């Protein structure tokens, strides 16, 4: 990953962590940690690695909650990075 990609990935990770901690009210997404963000070369797709504190049995409900909140999260990332086209967010456990 190039330096600009790395910088944007770090910013996305920080923004998503803050959003999940403070602004998302879905109880399925409590105690979810963003562990890494990887961008493709064109910065159109972001693969976000997440983990939930607690047990692995929450994986399905956490992924369902993230899928439901994906539009909100992408819009907020776009606003906070001040870019027109935020990368598409793909969450992985």
Label each PLM-derived region with a short phrase:
Residues 1-46, 51-93:
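Charge-rich, low-complexity N-terminal segments
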